[in-house]
Amino acid sequence: MENEKTIDALNELIEINNDRVEGYETASSETKSSDLKSLFSELTRTSQNNLSELRAEVNRLGGKPEEGTRVTGKFFRVWMDVKAALTGDDRGAILNSCEFGEDKALEAYEHVFENHTDQLNNEQLDMIRKQQTALRADHDRVKALRDAE
């Protein structure tokens, strides 16, 4: 399939956004803090919007959007750390874990830019840049809250 590498690159981003949705839904259900619940809901929406765009593009290219998450290691453990931190309701630890997760999401987008730009057209690159900008804004919100603790 001529679009296979493009679909693979887009599916990498789908996986990281699936991770993010799963992680923040877990975090939101576990915390008692209403401001964190609200934040996690907004962060989940960012990834849901990203997923909608990415899945539509994979479908347009004739591929099958990834449904799973990256259970290969680091990112999955981050969310387990978030859950453990939430059990103790330690805002600083929660936000620290969330910032680490945000770093991983940004790294996934950077990886696509560094390794797959020749497989993506201008519209796809623009979509991914826009998503990366939104994720960076989310990262900065989490970091600012963490720094304020």
Task: Spell out what each predicted region is.
Residues 9-29, 77-120, 124-127:
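Acidic/histidine-rich alpha-helical segments that form the ligand environment
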Residues 1-7, 61-64:
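Membrane-interacting alpha-helical segments
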Residues 35-73, 142-145:
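Conserved alpha-helical segments that form or flank metal/cofactor-binding pockets of metalloenzymes
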